[in-house]
Amino acid sequence: MQLPSSTKILVVGGGPAGSTAATLLAREGFEVTLVEKAIFPRYHIGESLLISVQPIIDLLGAREAVEAHGFQRKKGVLWEWGGERWLFDWKKLRYDYTFHVKREEFDEILLRNAQKNGVKVFEGIDISRLEFDGERPVAAKWSKSSTGESGTIQFEFLLDASGRAGLMATQYLRSRMFMKAFQNVATWGYWKGATIPEVEVEGPITVGSIPYGWIWGIPLRDQTMSVGLVIHQELFKEKRATQSVEEIYHEGLKASPLFQDVVLKGATLEPQIRTETDYSYISRTLAGPGFFLVGDSGAFIDPLLSSGVHLAMHSALLAAASVKSIIAGEVDMASATEFYQRCYQGHFLRWALIVASFYEVNARKETYFWTAQQLAHEELGVFNMSQADMKDVFATMVSGVVDLGDAQNAGRLQKGAERVHQYLDDDGREEDVTALLQKSKQRIFEYLDRVKNRDSRAAMQRYKAGGTETFSMGLDADGAVGGLYVTTEPRLGLLRKVVEERAEAATEAPAPAAPPPAVAEV
């Protein structure tokens, strides 16, 4: 199949963000072309999925293929953190499990699913340059190294899912902002014969802190375990002056009794050890005229809570719904891009707050690693958000994780967010962002204490009956941003909250009197 000279929608990148957005838009009847630099399957880190991806797997129609592949099921999380042990499980949620995956296999399933849904997929294609009409990208220069072919493809909409390479953010917008917090380095390898700790849940990811970092253990389906060490970049550089990467890795593992004496006892390390920087960043511009940055192209957050694929697939859903409604004339370009920008910023900030709060549990150890992870007031400037939007993030983040542990409907969610707003701003005036941040963290610490004390209602994340995160933005009427939110039924797109409110009012109004019986004509 020849790469076309033009397409309605061009998606750059075939990872979960690109394949999700492409599939959703192709199913709406649009011409979608996806180009990917690599040839799939290709290796990628980020193997532990959150439950929040499960509804999107269903939405994509990929459930059967994912289940049939036999990925290791993940029904919880085991933490040894700050000298304490916590076990999270999801027994009472709509989806009580998710997966640990080999990303080369999972990502290919999603990409082939995109092809089945009508997406034109081209692998081994490198995009070297974009052409613009004003601020709007309209064409891409491409080449295929395996054949020497090259050309130009024109498009109306660009979804940049190019990952950390960040086609738009790094080459044209130059808008990528790195956070001072979470500037870490990950080193990992794969072990045969590792032991999953014996706990009450199946296949948990195991996370353990050490004095100067933390370790993950992700069980994969072929009796292999991914085990990684995360330390601050400055310490990594310091150690590299006298130690090899392998020595740094093994020294870190030995600092954790959980991994040294339980998980890796009797296990064998495969030869290759990999290293990658985990610098967290977000683009100041995430959408604009005719373009959207999705997944890692727009933002990347510290891997502590395994949020990478979650952010990729959720941002893809937000972007696909926005593009569909623009094309259909349901929402204007400016409103849709503002909606996407604010939603993705909000999703990212919530994860940053939660990660910072977990790191702060260990801050009392007063090592450079733990103090370096703290999200300070000036750090929040990276998000380029209004104080009102930031306050909404704090309120809904805290209410979703803590205050509404038993929430099962949108009404309770809304009331919970209102209660937290009152808590954060109980004197009726705008507070300092630092104070809001600290109060949000305080509530998370209270939540962690509940988990530690085995409160039966406590869980790592709470989901509504529909399976969506309780603290998501833009994914239901109660999370509307700028009056807009995503709908997938009966068709994908953006709805205005006011429309739904009017519909509800009409439903609640007294029914009109029945008309008199018709009189038959004779």
Curated annotation (Swiss-Prot):
**If you read the UniProt record, what top EC class would you report for this enzyme, in one word?**
oxidoreductase
Which parts form a coiled-coil structure per UniProt?
Answer: none
Domain of life per record: Bacteria
EC number(s) recorded for this UniProt protein: 1.14.14.-
Q: Where does chloride bind?
A: 307-308
Q: Which GO terms describe its molecular function?
A: monooxygenase activity; nucleotide binding
Q: Which UniProt keywords apply?
A: Chloride, FAD, Flavoprotein, Monooxygenase, Nucleotide-binding, Oxidoreductase
GO terms for biological process, alphabetical:
toxin biosynthetic process
Matching entries from Pfam families are given as: Trp_halogenase
Q: Which residues bind FAD?
A: 17, 36, 42, 44-45, 48, 103, 127, 296, 309
Q: What else is known?
A: Chondramides are secondary metabolites with antifungal and cytotoxic activity. They are non-ribosomally produced depsipeptides consisting of a polyketide chain and 3 amino acids (alanine, N-methyltryptophan and beta-tyrosine or alpha-methoxy-beta-tyrosine).
Q: Which PANTHER family match?
A: FAD-BINDING DOMAIN-CONTAINING PROTEIN, FAD-BINDING PROTEIN
Described purpose of this protein according to its UniProt entry: Involved in the incorporation of a chlorinated tryptophan residue into halogenated forms of the secondary metabolites called chondramides.
Report the family membership: Belongs to the flavin-dependent halogenase family.
- Name by which UniProt lists this protein: Tryptophan 2-halogenase
Organism, by scientific name, is: Chondromyces crocatus
Gene field: cmdE
